Amino acid sequence: MLICRLIVTIATWLSAYVRGALSSRFILGVIGPLTNGSFAVGAWLAVTHLPTLYDVRRTWVSSLASARYNPAGYAYLGTVFLIVPLLLVPLPGYLSGCFRASAIRRAGFFLLWFGIVGLFLLGVETTIFPNPGRTRFSHQLFTTIAFIGITPGFLAFSLLAWRRAWIARTSLVPAALACAVLLLPGIGA
């Protein structure tokens, strides 16, 4: 009886997690820091295992995740690409629940899911099938899917937040900052 209740409780929580039916406190206090921390730790581990001294002026960021020149960094960042999409799973549902129904909300929802799936597939491809040779088409495809989905998906929700702030005559700085931060990965790619 206790095991059945435990299973039902876990299943209920996982269902709420996937639907994004979580509190703002959990999303902002747990998911956000874990996602950012995962990227930071993965990048730090990749830099510390780079065989040469990392100099941002002379070394490409992609060399941190090179299976040929930095296999340990490649493995660490591949693991991050497995963890981060799992952490991002509740965001499309949560963010959709923050705004009224519209075409941009639906587009943001689907783009964000598309990017999360692409990032997870990139993590699987990088971690399970490391390639010290030339870059495979699948790697380029999953990277493109992740960028095409995540950046515009977050941008759509940032624009909705900006619009809401504009209509309510509140500060536009948080929404504008979110838009700027979320455009950087797309510009860098």
Predicted segments, located by residue:
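Interfacial helix-start motif at the membrane-water boundary
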Residues: L64-P85
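N-terminal signal-anchor transmembrane alpha helix
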Residues: S23-H49
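Hydrophobic cores of alpha-helical transmembrane segments in multi-pass inner/ER membrane proteins
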Residues: R5, V80-P90, A146-F157
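Terminal transmembrane helical module of multi-pass membrane proteins
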Residues: F157-A189
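Short, Lys/Arg-rich, polar N-terminal cytosolic tail immediately upstream
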Residues: M1-L22
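Membrane-interface helix-boundary motifs at transmembrane edges
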Residues: Y94-A107, L160-S171
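Membrane-proximal helix-loop-helix units in multi-pass membrane proteins
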Residues: G115-W162
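Hydrophobic transmembrane helix segments
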Residues: W44-A67, L122-I128
